Every structure is written in structure tokens, then in C-alpha cells.
Amino acid sequence: MKIPFEEISRIVIEGNYASIFLISGKRYVLKTSLKRLQMKLNQELFIQSHRSTIVNLKLIGRIDLNRNKVIMKCGAELELGNKFRNSVKAAYH
């Protein structure tokens, strides 16, 4: 399956499966790892925001550092891991 990078909003890993959420609202589930996906993604467009989440930088609405959340333009609120706070904040601004 080929999905254009710019159509991916976020990727959430649950166990051995990755849920790929598209801007259109569609969701695809693949059996793969976070590391495998990171190798295929455009590193300038995507950043890891949590141990199980990768987000599209262009689709971040805002970052709430008080609540450790990444709020996507679509309204989805995702956890922001302490380990990833600084890198997400720097890449977003």
C-alpha cells in the first residue's frame, strides 16, 4: 500500500500494529514497528511525539506543554512524552 506522506496525519503504534490516520479521516492498520515506519517517513515532515506516536509537523495545531499534549488541526489530542518535548517544540516553531 502506498500512501502519500502529506496525507498522513499521525501514526499510533499499539503492540505489533500501526494505525495510520489520514487527513481524510480514513485509518489503515498495518503489522509493523515504529522503527520500520520511521525509516520510510520523510524526517522533515514527521516527528516522534511519544514512544508510540509519530505526528505530521504540518498538521499540528498547537502544543500544550502544561498538559503534555499535541493538539492536531483535526482536533485530536495526543500525548506528548517528556523525552520528546524539546524536539517537538523546536521542530514545531
Regions found by a protein language model. Give the residues of each.
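Basic, polyanion-interacting recognition surfaces, primarily
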Residues: M1-H93
